[in-house]
Structures are given as C-alpha cells and as structure tokens.
C-alpha cells in the first residue's frame, strides 16, 4: 500500500537552499518547498510502503549535510 508523508525539516543556518536543492534529486520526493516558520523546508514523499518510507527518511534525508532535525507526518487520509 502506497504511503505519503510530509517531512518538516530544520536546517543549519545558511544551508536551507542547499538542502532543498539536494532533496529535489532524491527518488520518491513529490515536492520540496523552502518555507518560513519553525521549519525551513517541507518535503512531500511517496513510497510504496511504510518501510521504504522509513528507509528514505533515515538514509536519504537524515544523512544530508545541513539537516538538523526532522518531523515526519504520515498521511492517513482526507
């Protein structure tokens, strides 16, 4: 079952645009936006299942230089 999530990302000072640019090339990213507020970037990801989503977040997002913290909000329906 396909899974969708919103990833709220806090970046290191001066790294926001670099992180956003790198995220756009990661497979599974539906959209990446630089935003204002307590988070610097919001990414929307699609994955075939929750395990793949977890791997994407922990291995592709958490490991990026400039990423300080993330919050993953899994979509549960409308």
Show the residue positions of the predicted features.
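A compositional/biophysical signature of low hydrophobicity enriched in polar/charged and small residues
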Residues: 1-78
């Amino acid at each position: 079952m396909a899974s969708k999530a919103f990833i709220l990302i806090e970046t290191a000072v001066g790294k926001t645009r670099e992180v956003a640019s790198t995220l756009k090339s990661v497979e599974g990213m539906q959209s990446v936006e630089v935003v204002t507020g307590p988070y610097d970037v919001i990414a929307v990801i699609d994955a075939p299942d929750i395990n793949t989503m977890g791997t994407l977040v922990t291995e592709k997002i958490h490991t990026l230089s400039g990423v300080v913290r993330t919050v993953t909000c899994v979509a549960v329906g409308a």
